Amino acid sequence: MHTPARTATAAALAAATAVALAACSTPADDEAPGVTDDTVTIGTHQPLTGPAAAGYSAISAATSAYFAYLNDNGGVHGRDIEYIVKDDGYDPSATQSAVRELVTEDEVLAIVNGLGTPTHSAVLDYLDEQEVPDLFVSSGSLTWNQPGVYPNTFAFNADYVTEGAALAQYAVEQRPDATICVLGQDDDYGEGILEGVETVVDGNAIAEIQTYSTANEDVTAQIGAMMAAGCEVNVLGTINGFTAMAVGTAAALDWAPQWYVSSSGGDYPTLVGYLGEDVAPALLQGMVSVNYLPFSPDDPWVALFRQINDDYNDGAPFTGNTVFGMSVGYLFAEALAAAGEDPTRASLVAAVESGELLGNGIVPLSYGPDDHAAYRSVGITVVDDGVQDYTGTVYSVDAGQVTTVEAEPVPLANDGIPQPPEE
Amino acid sequence: MDRLVFLLATGLARGAVLALFALSLVIVWRAARAVNFAQAAMAVCAVYIAFALTAASGSYWLGLAGGLAAGAALGAAVERGLMRRLPHLTPLPGMICAIGLVMVLQSGLAIAFGPEHRPMRPPFSQSPFVIGGVPVLSPYDLFVLVTAAAVMGALALLFAGTSLGLRLRAAAFAPETSRLLGVRVPRMVTIGWALSVAAAALAAILLVPTELGLNPHAADLLFVNAFAVAVIGGLDSPAGALAAGLGVGVLVSLTTGYVSASAAPLAVLALLTAVLLLRPGGLFAAREARRA
Amino acid sequence: MRTLLRAALITLLAIAATFGLDPFRNYQLATAAGVFAAVAGLTVLIGLTGQLSLGHAVLMAAGGYGYAATATAVDAAAPDAGPAALLAGLAGAAAASGALGLLLGMAAARLRGPYLAGLTLALVIALPSAANVLPLGGEQGLSAPFLPVPEALSALIAVEQWHAWLAILISAAAVTPLVLLRAGRPGLRMRAVLGDETAAALAGVRPGPVKTAAFVASAVPAGLGGAVLAVATQQVTPGGYGLAFSLTLVVAAVIGGLGSIGGAAIGAVLVVALPWLVDTAVEAVPADLGQRLNGNLAVLLFGAVVIAATLARPDGAAGLLARLRRPTPAAPTPATPSTNTER
């Protein structure tokens, strides 16, 4: 019979194939991998394919566009930034493979803006073991802010609990007697928003709590239940597509409650893309959301980012994701500029921890040696007449306490090209 | 009570689309003894054509007709160009080829049109009629139900009452004998594929306006649920596809409404397991398929 | 005995090969070893008994969860217990996947081809929901203990290489019994059931128990493969075992050649390496076509390769090897489509 001999041959062949794939590079163990005389190489993992690509593939494109603009204007310390974007299709095992390749093969200086809670959780321990700076994670999970456990990991988004608490606080102030309900994604995102709402509103006072799963693009049953429960203010911990679906489904039922939406699902231009330009302004009128990045139509940052989007991103649709991606790029460039003439992994982390980075938010960054969260306060936005803008109300959330604070927008300087700190 | 009526009505409308897609799987199974794993990707290709035609002409109906024609053409092309060239002794090469085709079509669509969701307008209002204070079916839901029922009826007539239907079934069940009797078996298989993908395209065209919008993955879940529906109903049985489709639609709606959204796939799995344990060939299994 | 020697030899060769690989390649090798164990189980199931399972990813996940839960518990109860956590974890993986395999196998014994396919497909879709409803950590999954390089070796090898060794050893332990099973009496019984159930029953082989046993025998290596992935990644998430991955396992089994363990090895290496190779090749081409091409082109080319390979060699790589060894063409397979396609 053929079996054992053939098995041996085939296995040997497979092993030989694997050996043939071997490249001769070994990871450099110096302190500044990815840094040459004229380049700095960094990497990220993003969902470029698969169902999650629809919402998020625009972010890394915007970041790349900002870096192209930066490189055309001299880069940082004379070095161009090379941004390697790896696709993980929002699959945690693909993230594992992508990030290991970035660290060991591409020898990146840092991982920047890795997207997603389940995906990035999968590489958190690995990046910690390898002591790779893990900057500006693109998710609102509280996991990223554990300086004692993960000294090199830093969050970028305001966390979901903060957003939920701010939305609930605004709802209570605007409409003290309204019936509040929550619709959330069936994961840490929805749970975080709910937790935030519960810090402001007593859990029993939430009339209806519904969840959805991204696999099933239908929220009719959930919206029906909320309508039956007489909800007046619906706090949504939903991604943009499901925000649109919730609003559209309610409209079909002739139901017009107030929508209070987390920043991850309350981006007006993206929602218009889902709902269609003809009906969106009416359906989204009065929608409340939160944000911490420049988004007012007349903001100089927005004007600059629009220009970069036209020049370096083929004029892709300009949405909240565009601002998000470019803001991440700017913040990294600022950190790199502050990390010194010859940046290392350690000096990059030290630069972020120094607390001296400004970013470009409407509220201050909160990075420090003991705090790896980026934004602890958020501003309320409202859609009026097809324009989403800040109301001026800003909440800071700390240890379950919501307090009103003043906005402190960072002014645009030097055309968005970070300068090395003065000696 | 109000909530029950609302959930039942919603479930029926969703179930009609499921039933139609499951029917398309039954057609290709009857015609070629194959489960087409690329059915969703092929249907979505046809929807993109329908979408483009509607956008260009402004007429939903022109887009619908174009989408159906494109589905039929795609089905015939895939059968002639790919499936026919594979050995039919086992279903596996056809299945693997279909999985490869899914990758090619979905990434091709994503390259050509981007991953964005494109909103598709329904031809009728989605605001439900309110009866006794309870919102029930919308005009669009009724359109979906009527269309699905009409297509089911037409196909039942085709298979039971016409010579073409007879030849289609004969070619699938007894290809050798049919050939001897003068049935052009290869042509029958091609016709079966074309009919099947056209039906799947119709189901997808009906589904997309109720979802987020058209994207390369718009029909993925539809396929998976419809496959479960076809298996529950019995792969040979159009009536089974109809009954199981409506049943699964209602089950998903009730589970989502009364338990939680994440419990719905488990409920479908439980129903599927229960039915198969009691009737291994599905609810409406023909006697021949039940021997085991 | 010869099989055992051969298995030991191949295992040693594979371990020796890890010295020629850099850390990332060793990580890929560990992944491929885990996938190999699962594909080997699947290929024996489909090739010998004709039962088409689309749900082997869930069996892998069951093994991964079993490993993570048990190993974490043992690690917490007795830290520094050395290999105890690993061994207990592997036992947990085998138990979890074996139990699920038994349940599925009992259902599968009553079902024919597409019906079993439908059931296992629904199982894959239900996995994320099950992870939410059961205490399996939801979307984030469970984490498994990190196994550092033993001190005696730490000067010699990196952690990726150590994990590759573990992966190779576990996979060898998972697949070798499968090879023995396939060559021995159980293999004959399975083939008898595949050939003609009625004839097999007349010859005293009861098809039901044989099919169920084959499912369990296929599920345990798959579960150990899941444990291998948990060792290499320290994580089990439902997202890692989705529909696409489950279908990829079937693709690997068929491309390798059904029923062939060597083919399973080729298939596993292909599905791990090919997308990455294509991706690398695509990156080398200056792509000014914008972000849409990014990632998608790799999937497209992978799909095209799968189609081309199926058209060229429906019997897979193992069939191609057999053809190369034996210059005279094999006897033509009967091409009559008949009712037995309804397996």
Q: What kind of feature is each model-predicted range?
A:
Chain C
Residues M1-R343:
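Transmembrane alpha-helices and adjacent helix-loop boundaries
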